[in-house]
A protein has these predicted regions:
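Single conserved hydrophobic/aromatic residue that forms the stacking wall/gate
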Residues: 1-11
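Structural motif of enzymes handling amino- and sulfur-group chemistry
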Residues: 12-33
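Conserved glycine-rich beta-strand-loop-beta hairpin in the small C-terminal domain of fold type I
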Residues: 18, 31, 35-45, 57-71
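Residue-level recognition of strand-loop junctions within catalytic nucleotide-signaling folds
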Residues: 22, 70-72, 116-118
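Short, conserved charged micro-motifs
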Residues: 75-84, 121-125
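PLP-dependent enzyme catalytic core of the Aspartate aminotransferase-like
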Residues: 90-91, 104-134
Length: 134
């Protein structure tokens, strides 16, 4: 009866969410989450500008959980997101190369960084390590 158990889980999850919403906690939670992610986004942008400088281009995110960036190859630095991903892993940092996000003709210089789960200190440390990988 795996399907019956799944249905019961969905009903319980919906009931829990409904109680949470009815209690009026959502506005406070959203305000807190927005503040946390805005701080993380700002920390990521500041760290990228400081550590990577003209080696990358990116737009400071105004929402969401990711920074979309493009390697410029400035100063003879790495210009391929797939190559950088391998080097970054050696430094203990992971990100997603941009090529899987293209339907056709991928830009190999692109990559996506997440600030969803790391606190500000970890973001700064991760970007510093990324700078070492470049």
């Amino acid at each position: 009866y795996p399907l019956r158990r799944q249905r019961q889980m969905c009903i319980r999850d919906r009931a829990t969410a409904a109680q949470y919403l009815k209690a009026g906690r959502m506005p406070g939670t959203l305000a807190h989450v927005r503040k946390v992610y805005a701080e993380r986004a700002q920390a990521m942008g500041d760290a990228l500008r400081k550590e990577l400088g003209d080696a990358i281009e990116f737009v400071q995110p105004q929402g969401g959980l990711f920074v979309w960036a493009r390697l410029t190859g400035a100063g003879g630095k790495v210009a391929d997101g797939n190559v950088l991903a391998k080097r970054a892993i050696e430094k203990g940092v992971a990100f997603v190369p941009g090529t899987p996000f293209f339907c056709a003709n991928p830009d190999h210089a692109t990559f996506r960084l997440s600030f969803a789960t790391a606190d500000v200190d970890k973001i700064r440390e991760g970007v510093a390590r990324l700078g070492q990988a470049i």
